[in-house]
């Protein structure tokens, strides 16, 4: 390892590796700490993320975008309410090649790992090293965040997310599907290309229902899933394992700070700083936007400023908290709205969905916000005097 390290990043997941590559290409010397160890490979990794156009452009710039078979374009999206309220989006109406891309996590992690391996300014470590700036990208259960004494404000949802992969009897046609029902929120995310017959499933239900679904035999689970989706893609067959995790809305009260008497500053990014309900499909997009903003501000700083300069880090915190707020509020509002079972509320929300689906300009604007959020800060460099 070089004698001097500029930035130590704890957490070598997608967000941490992306930050390491962004900084390293600007000549910043990075120690990337991966304390998790290599995956066992005993079970197939079923994780998939919906990435927007901003995230794709970022990863393509780093030459880390997965091959086509691992990044399926979402050409259409169908959202069905629990009593006749439907909303439809399509990429053509939004004048875009895709609304989003569903990316296999193992494929993306492999591309990032390869890029890190051949980046001379990044060294992969098993333990943390001293550096002027520590960036925490350890996820929602970050131990380092707790050690720093940062309060993580958590509001649990009365739901657990269940994830699975299933083979479908009919091609998905590049359509992402989402159902809101009395039982919860079910999403089918297309995989394997526009004519593929595999989907990633995310089913948000009550914890006891999630446990019951986990205990079903694969054929029975697939049958239950097909019924919940109204047979939209024909007969379903479970592929591999299922997994669950509790849902929560969370945000750290502080995203940066200084360690007294050490000359070291710290910052949080990704799920270590915030989490939202998965119904938005924006979790990883928000984390990638965090590190893109942090890297931009660090590399745009005046030469006389250290990477540990608190003015730079506070600017990052202000920008990202402001950018996060619209998605945080809208996602939480939808989650709370569809969790209510009163007949009047149910009728009102479905009426609202039907009306929304008829307003073409509004639908196109919403689709554009999902693909290219207007509240993302312009990535153009800024001068050192802008830090205050």
Role assignments for model-derived ranges:
Residues 209-308:
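FAD/FMN-dependent oxidoreductases across multiple families
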Residues 59, 136-244, 251, 256:
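Conserved FAD-binding catalytic core of PHBH/FMO-like flavoproteins
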Residues 2-3, 57-61, 70-147, 153-160:
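Conserved N-terminal helical subregion
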Residues 4-8, 12-75:
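Glycine-rich FAD cofactor-binding loop and adjacent beta-loop-alpha segment at the N-terminus
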Residues 7, 30, 132-134, 267:
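Hydrophobic "anchor" residues on beta-strands that sit immediately upstream
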Residues 296-388:
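C-terminal helical "tail/cap" subdomain of flavin- and related membrane-associated enzymes
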Residues 11-16, 139, 270, 283:
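Conserved phosphate-binding and hydrolysis motifs of nucleotide-dependent enzymes
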């Amino acid at each position: 390892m070089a004698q001097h390290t500029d930035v130590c990043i704890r957490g070598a997941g997608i967000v941490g590796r992306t930050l390491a590559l962004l900084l390293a290409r600007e000549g910043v010397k990075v120690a990337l700490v991966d304390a998790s160890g290599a995956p066992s490979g005993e079970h197939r990794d079923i994780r998939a993320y919906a990435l927007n156009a901003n995230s794709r452009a970022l990863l393509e710039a780093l030459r880390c975008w997965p091959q086509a078979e691992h990044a399926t374009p979402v050409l259409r999206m169908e959202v069905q309410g629990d009593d006749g309220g439907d909303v439809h989006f399509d990429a053509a109406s939004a004048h875009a090649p895709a609304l989003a891309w569903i990316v296999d996590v193992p494929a993306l992690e492999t591309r990032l790992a390869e890029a890190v391996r051949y980046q001379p300014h990044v060294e992969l470590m098993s333990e943390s090293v001293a550096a002027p700036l520590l960036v925490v990208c350890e996820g929602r259960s970050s131990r380092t965040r707790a050690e720093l004494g940062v309060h993580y404000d958590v509001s649990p949802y009365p739901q657990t997310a269940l994830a699975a992969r299933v083979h479908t009897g009919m091609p998905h046609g590049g359509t992402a599907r989402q159902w809101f029902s009395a039982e919860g929120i079910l999403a089918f995310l297309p995989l394997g290309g526009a004519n593929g017959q595999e989907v990633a499933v995310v089913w948000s239900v009550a914890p006891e229902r999630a446990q019951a679904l986990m205990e079903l035999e694969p054929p029975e689970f697939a049958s239950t899933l097909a019924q919940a989706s109204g047979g939209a893609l024909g007969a379903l067959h479970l592929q591999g394992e299922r997994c669950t995790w509790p849902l929560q809305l969370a945000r750290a009260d502080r995203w940066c700070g200084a360690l007294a008497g050490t000359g070291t500053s710290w910052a949080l990014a990704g799920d270590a700083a915030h989490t939202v309900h998965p119904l938005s499909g924006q979790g990883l997009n928000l984390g990638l936007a965090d590190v893109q903003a942090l890297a931009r501000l660090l590399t745009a700083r005046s030469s006389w400023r250290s990477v540990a300069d608190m003015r730079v880090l506070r600017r990052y915190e202000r920008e990202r908290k402001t950018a996060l707020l619209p998605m945080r509020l809208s996602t939480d509002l939808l989650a709370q709205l569809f969790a209510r079972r009163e007949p009047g509320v149910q009728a009102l929300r479905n009426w609202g969905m039907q009306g929304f689906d008829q307003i073409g300009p509004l639908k196109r604007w919403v689709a554009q916000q999902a693909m290219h959020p207007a509240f993302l800060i312009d990535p153009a460099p800024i001068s050192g005097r802008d830090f205050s």
